[in-house]
Amino acid sequence: MNNKKIFELIFWVLMSVLMFILITGFALTATLFMLIAPVPFMLITRRLGPKMTAIGVLIGVSCIYLLSDPFTSIIYIITFCALGVAFGTISLRAKNGFDYMLFSIAASVFSKIILITVFSQLTGSNPFMIDPEVTNKMISTAANIFSKAGISAPSLSLKDYAKILTDRLSLLMPSMLILFAAMDSLLSYCLASHIVKRLKYEPIVKMPPFGEWRCPQNIFLALLVSLAVDLASRAFPDKRQLVVISANLLEVLRAIFIIQGLSLAWYFMTLRKVHRFFKSTFVIFGIIFSPISYILYIVGIFDICYDLRKLIRRKLK
């Protein structure tokens, strides 16, 4: 065990501990650091091997235990250590970018299910069930802000909206879990790839450029299944399981089609030599602005059906 490896191990473990402290202590940075939480142990696993990784996990968990409590240490083990080791192992064994993303998302979802199970057992509450009181407080705060600006809303409509929002969020929690897993898998990959390139480590398996991303046409089988389940849920409205499966499957497919539409838009803008800043800005607006995301949703479906890139290339010839 040489000094360079010891220094790398200590550096990445301390970086992981610092990120965890920032997540627990600063709400504004929590989401960002949560999405890239696995990166330090992902790099340790790739760079230093299983023995050094085990030592790193022991050091990291000991630091968190000394700074907080056993429950917080469990969260750190699952979200930072275990998931980082999983991402690192997958990145070493994956043959291509698609395999990496598929298995990383599965590992991320599995880790979050374990975390939710542990949380439920220790606290006795279900994280999938959102407390209506919390939603009411959020909406009341928003209503107070609007009232100060001269915009008022009846309290009854706010309560109704709070109930609808609570029910909707509880219903779509599984799909939100999957989409969050996809986000942390992708962002961890991007950050780790950048670090590996800068430090000249062993390169991570490459993913195709965003403009070349294409879903296989058999994705429509999942769409047909979701529509069939949706019809069944309407025929048997008392079966909540059908409603949950249908709503979440449709939400995940909607996200996939929007990403497909964004990929096509990125491809077209690349051909037109649009600056990367403007392409990235369009992607952000396409995700958060509903009218644009709906158009991208339709475009994504057509692109999977007809491969619109071929049509674009033919017209440009």
Name every feature range the model reports, one short phrase each.
Residues 239-317:
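Long, positively charged, glycine-interspersed low-complexity recognition regions
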Residues 199-256, 260:
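Small-residue-rich helix-loop
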Residues 30-89, 303:
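Alpha-helical membrane segments and adjacent membrane-interface helices in multi-pass membrane proteins
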Residues 1-59, 273, 277-280:
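Hydrophobic transmembrane alpha-helices
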Residues 6-14, 54-58, 74, 78, ...:
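Hydrophobic alpha-helical transmembrane segments
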Residues 117-169:
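Membrane-interface interhelical loops and short interface/amphipathic helices
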Residues 151-204:
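Selected alpha-helical membrane-embedding segments in polytopic membrane proteins
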Residues 12, 76-121:
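Short helix-perturbing small/polar motifs within transmembrane alpha-helices
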